[in-house]
């Protein structure tokens, strides 16, 4: 059903046909758009002992629905399957807000403390930095952006999530990237499911697109 | 907190003494007397621990512990000539939340377990005889959930029901006659039934299309034992474990599905996944067990297929322990069997009457849980003890009943 099977479709440019049905020209255009978003919004400068990567997901739901889930810094559990509970210190949501996230059992962490670095409702950009917790992701910083696109002639959304993080002692860059990507794939798969379910429940009028 | 810790230390000492009791000959030296006095104090503290931890956090382990003393009284004595034993003499189970915030372990005990679904049996010749055999079989299981308790709870509700169906279907298909082939066929049928059961329950827990966020990332280990008059069938999926005490020797009846087990790692990699050491070896760096019920997001790397052991019983078989890794992470198979043996034989209770409350299977399970807590287990802890043969002498038993 949802399994994280195979490599295809996650990396930027992998999924040239992601827009669906449009043939090589449209696919090329979609790939070019992704590359442009990447260059403009997801440029990390990983250090010697860091790794960085980006993943993409095409969602069959309009941008405003997907963005409403992504932007809820205080409620990541709305779509992130590994989060059991989240509390924002202070209450008000603003740049610099810090959330305490509790992670479900069976995972290599139980808590994570994360700071909101950037929330841009015009450009649809969310950036979060990990500042504490019992996980092994030191200096983890992520950027999520969402972009409107057309999937089979219907309003869809392209989500790009990129990150940079220290490679911990005892692991290689490759392993670190693989692990983080596995977690992000789960999150994006779940984001797609929740968004698509919402889209079916509340079909949007053409005016909202 | 500090008093809590010291109580646990005391409990640990009591257990160490119980362990050591085996080797010590009963000469009342001064040190032995001092130890006894010390233990008397421990008796109170240990029962305080029992009140705090057990009463508050111990989940009533079905009705098995109250059952067990009853069934112990009526159970027929095994006779040496016949190669059939009562499926189990008694059984007991304890399941505690331990130091975790959530309780995600579940246990289930049903003895006899096939009798419940008897009405479902097709009437016909030969069925009555089969039923006579079935009634002796006991079902015992430990489920250790992760990512939530939903799948472990589903296992507790469904595994024995589904297994009964799968076993019944295969039993009814069985032809008459005897011989060595029948034995082999029977074993093969048990393996099939277990595999079919695990697959079906795995399908049930992940099914719903409209599943909520997080439904895909819930799972549970499962270790299931069916104890019959002639053999024990253990099916395991994950890192809970079944261990048999045979003539005082611990014989594991399951092999943990850890991602770094060479054959498991090979299987995961062949399926396109990776095992990464990220706070211990994990599938994709995420999950620390390589097989489970549920965990749809990790398929096909994490599978629900059980490994099945069919073990013929011998007259040396004493008891069976099923437990979650909350026990096995801190207690070895050998130590667990030794503790349970001392308890079931009545030696622990007669030597330390105030720290060890009795010699039933439930007492043995409780003692193992205490030991795990005292050794710093941070997980939920679930232990099922199935007594296969009376270890206690009649005199000890009657003394205890009269106390």
From Swiss-Prot, chain A:
The keyword Zinc does not apply. GO terms for cellular component: cytoplasm; cytosol; nucleus. One of its GO terms (molecular function) is abscisic acid binding. The record marks 108, 172 as: Involved in interactions with PP2Cs. A motif (Gate loop) lies at residues 105-109. The keyword Cytoplasm applies. Disulfide bonds join 51-177. Induction: Repressed by abscisic acid (ABA) and drought stress. Expressed in leaf sheaths and leaf blades. Expressed at low levels in roots, flowers and seeds. Keywords: Abscisic acid signaling pathway, Cytoplasm, Disulfide bond, Nucleus, Protein phosphatase inhibitor, Receptor, Stress response. Belongs to the PYR/PYL/RCAR abscisic acid intracellular receptor family. Monomer. Interacts with PP2C30. Binding to PP2C30 is dependent on the presence of abscisic acid (ABA). Interacts with PP2C51. Binding to PP2C51 is dependent on the presence of ABA. Interacts with PP2C50. Binding to PP2C50 is dependent on the presence of ABA. Interacts with PP2C53. Intracellular abscisic acid (ABA) receptor that functions as a positive regulator of ABA signaling pathway. Together with ABI5, PP2C30 and SAPK2, is part of an ABA signaling unit that modulates seed germination and early seedling growth. Acts as a positive regulator of abiotic stress-responsive gene expression. Inhibits the protein phosphatases PP2C06 and PP2C09 when activated by ABA. This is Abscisic acid receptor PYL5.
From Swiss-Prot, chain B:
Residues 42-80 are annotated as: Disordered. It comes from the Eukaryota. Residues 90-388 form the PPM-type phosphatase domain. Pfam families: PP2C. InterPro entries: PP2C (IPR015655), PP2C_BS (IPR000222), PPM-type-like_dom_sf (IPR036457), PPM-type_phosphatase-like_dom (IPR001932). Binds 2 magnesium or manganese ions per subunit. It catalyses: O-phospho-L-seryl-[protein] + H2O = L-seryl-[protein] + phosphate; O-phospho-L-threonyl-[protein] + H2O = L-threonyl-[protein] + phosphate. Keywords: Hydrolase, Magnesium, Manganese, Metal-binding, Protein phosphatase. It is an enzyme of class 3 (hydrolase). Mn(2+) 1 binds at residues 144-145. Its EC number is 3.1.3.16. Coiled coil: none annotated. Belongs to the PP2C family. This is Probable protein phosphatase 2C 8. It comes from Oryza sativa subsp. japonica (Rice). The lineage of its organism: Eukaryota, Viridiplantae, Streptophyta, Embryophyta, Tracheophyta.
